[in-house]
């Protein structure tokens, strides 16, 4: 989200045909430096991220009412409701000096038909039925799933959670769906984690390492 705010529309650039090019990373260079500096500032300048806090600690503190806000997704809402947390959904503000709004990576769940199925036609028809607006509304009401169908969102527009996420989603970018994404996750995480752990960490070196 922070990398997108500072200019990286995705992890990878696109080629002339509009396909993701795994040889061209967008999260390094000046974009990476600014994003990492902001993350570092959250910890050491603004003191908004306490020392030693990871997702588990932050999530637990939010459920206990000891944390004012958390960056999270629809998957966490069930636990928050069980903990009786009075919460709302809102886009993260644009970081200082950012050229774009903050935006998360987006992913969707789908229905997959087995290529070896003996009843492909019936399976496809069933899959199409599952993703109709009416059934997506039913999935939301039964399990809190956030629909991507505009017609379903329209039907649920009075639901504050659905309404909140519907304002966040347009700001996001699709999660890269190429195999090379998995190879970036580890080094990216290893390179960015120290920004909130060490006040002397060189944020200019990390983006260079990502591009190496």
Regions found by a protein language model. Name each.
Residues 1, 31-41, 57, 75, ...:
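Extracytoplasmic/secreted proteins, especially bacterial periplasmic and envelope-associated proteins
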């Amino acid at each position: 989200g922070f990398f997108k705010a500072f200019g990286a529309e995705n992890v990878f650039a696109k080629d002339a045909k509009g396909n993701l090019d795994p040889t061209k990373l967008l999260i390094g260079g000046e974009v990476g430096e600014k994003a990492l500096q902001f993350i570092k500032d959250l910890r050491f300048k603004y003191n908004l991220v306490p020392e030693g806090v990871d997702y588990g600690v932050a999530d637990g503190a939010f459920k206990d009412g000891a944390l004012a806000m958390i960056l999270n997704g629809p998957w966490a809402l069930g636990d928050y409701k069980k903990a009786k947390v009075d919460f709302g959904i809102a886009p993260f503000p644009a970081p200082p000096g950012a050229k774009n709004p903050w935006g998360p990576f987006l992913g969707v769940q789908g229905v997959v038909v087995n290529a070896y199925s003996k009843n492909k036609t019936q399976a496809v028809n069933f899959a199409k039925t599952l993703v109709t607006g009416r059934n997506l509304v039913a999935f939301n009401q039964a399990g809190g799933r956030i629909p991507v169908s505009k017609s379903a969102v329209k039907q649920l527009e009075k639901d504050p959670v659905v309404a909140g996420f519907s304002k966040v989603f347009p700001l996001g970018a699709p999660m890269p769906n190429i195999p090379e994404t998995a190879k970036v996750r580890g080094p990216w995480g290893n390179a960015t984690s120290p920004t909130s752990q060490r006040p002397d960490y060189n944020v200019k070196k990390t983006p260079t390492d990502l591009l190496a």
